[in-house]
Amino acid sequence: MLRPLLLLWLWGRLGALTQGTPAGTAPTKDVVDLEFYTKRLFQSVSPSFLSITIDASLATDPRFLTFLGSPRLRALARGLSPAYLRFGGTKTDFLIFDPNKEPTSEERSYWQSQDNNDICGSERVSADVLRKLQMEWPFQELLLLREQYQREFKNSTYSRSSVDMLYSFAKCSRLDLIFGLNALLRTPDLRWNSSNAQLLLNYCSSKGYNISWELGNEPNSFWKKAHISIDGLQLGEDFVELHKLLQKSAFQNAKLYGPDIGQPRGKTVKLLRSFLKAGGEVIDSLTWHHYYLNGRVATKEDFLSSDVLDTFILSVQKILKVTKEMTPGKKVWLGETSSAYGGGAPLLSDTFAAGFMWLDKLGLSAQLGIEVVMRQVFFGAGNYHLVDENFEPLPDYWLSLLFKKLVGPKVLMSRVKGPDRSKLRVYLHCTNVYHPRYREGDLTLYVLNLHNVTKHLKLPPPMFSRPVDKYLLKPFGSDGLLSKSVQLNGQTLKMVDEQTLPALTEKPLPAGSSLSVPAFSYGFFVIRNAKIAACI
């Protein structure tokens, strides 16, 4: 039953189906009918489906890890819980743990201010320290981006204090930490040298830390980054070696994820196949990365293109096909993803316009069976962050927060009737049962309108007779789609104070209303009292 539904949905998404509006409905192109498939669940994703990353580049100069002690930053991260926090990225393979390295003065200042009995309740970073780091951050960010563009990466070391800072951030933000280990530490015969990982495991074990692990980042690009070529067979054997280390340590029950490959193109797919053959059994979920565009050349039109959005489908299908063939039943995660690679697209990836890519990727991932999607990056260098250098939440943060509050892990299916559905994209889940306003059986519909006119959506019977809560997001200010401020139902979203998120207030619609979605906007509609058995 599910396979025919999936084919129907995919054909509709790619524009192959051209059903007309049913007889008796108004022949206007701006009023559209929806179809819901709610008899059974289509997919089920993790409660931590929407997760986040901290790029390993933040530890290049460990002083800047002190940012993670900010109560404001932690409050923003806590809003996205439950979630995984992945510490990884290109610099993963250029970071070396030095247990004898002394903490930086900034780190030392932070730890001296802590109450060891209540580390999450007492954390305060000196305002002077934060101000100094924020003044220096633009220069550090330029160094990191230049290193990335020039592909000239240098090894850096991090201390026990750096690990403590990262773990403290995850724990106090109620996130589950996934730590990426350096895979480019090699013996002369190119096997993985696990000695540095062993030092880190020993330290984390002594502290009682609960951590999951990865090994390496985008191994398909090792030659470009370090002039070292590792094939999938060797990489699989390296993961088996890491798994053995974990089994001999306090981390015998820890999860292991990988191989964090890049886009699924020819040689990368070949690497994945041989990796899964050699090491597929020891990973708990398969991880891969996706970006739509090159951040240096991406345009506003690209960010609003349904054709660009649809390219993601084919990438997912390639990954799922290989996974099913080599390791049937293995869960697949998007271990790192955003709009554009290379740190994002300036003046685009941190604006309202980026939300179309982000929300659509979440919808497609859930529909296609990706269990977890890790957003690059929560905070850090580049333009694709959720929170900026002043700890101000950006449009994609607010979009992520709404998704967390309203969207549950049980996935259903919705479809727009009629032709040209690619610019009006709809997704349907059971509502998050932990939202105090809603109950089991309610539905959450989320919608993206890429048309330049308002679209009026008509719910199918019997849903059209149910009350609906609207959560519509629109840009605020004269910058329009390039704005870094967002309004929810006409109210600008901003933090109440340093540690308090605003209320996300619904706009109730009377039963029988059409759902109006203005041009170039997106939002959520919670259908109350839907009483869908599959959601209960």
Swiss-Prot record:
Q: Which organism is it from?
A: Rattus norvegicus (Rat)
For this UniProt record, the keywords arranged alphabetically read as follows:
Calcium, Cell adhesion, Disulfide bond, Glycoprotein, Hydrolase, Lysosome, Magnesium, Membrane, Nucleus, Secreted, Signal
How would you describe this protein's topology in the membrane? Peripheral membrane protein
Question: What's the protein name?
Answer: Heparanase
Q: Which GO terms describe its cellular component?
A: extracellular matrix; extracellular space; heparanase complex; lysosomal membrane; lysosome; membrane raft; nucleus
Role: Endoglycosidase that cleaves heparan sulfate proteoglycans (HSPGs) into heparan sulfate side chains and core proteoglycans. Participates in extracellular matrix (ECM) degradation and remodeling. Selectively cleaves the linkage between a glucuronic acid unit and an N-sulfo glucosamine unit carrying either a 3-O-sulfo or a 6-O-sulfo group. Can also cleave the linkage between a glucuronic acid unit and an N-sulfo glucosamine unit carrying a 2-O-sulfo group, but not linkages between a glucuronic acid unit and a 2-O-sulfated iduronic acid moiety.
Q: How does it assemble?
A: Heterodimer; heterodimer formation between the 8 kDa and the 50 kDa subunits is required for enzyme activity. Interacts with TF; the interaction, inhibited by heparin, enhances the generation of activated factor X and activates coagulation. Interacts with HRG; the interaction is enhanced at acidic pH, partially inhibits binding of HPSE to cell surface receptors and modulates its enzymatic activity. Interacts with SDC1; the interaction enhances the shedding of SDC1. Interacts with HPSE2.
- Which residue positions are annotated as catalytic? 218 (proton donor), 336 (nucleophile)
Q: What is its EC number?
A: 3.2.1.166
- Cystine bridges: 120-172, 430-535
| UniProt PTM | Proteolytically processed. The cleavage of the 65 kDa form leads to the generation of a linker peptide, and the 8 kDa and 50 kDa products. The active form, the 8/50 kDa heterodimer, is resistant to degradation. Complete removal of the linker peptide appears to be a prerequisite to the complete activation of the enzyme.
Region of interest: Required for transferring proheparanase to the Golgi apparatus, secretion and subsequent enzyme activity and for enhancement of PKB/AKT1 phosphorylation: 520-536
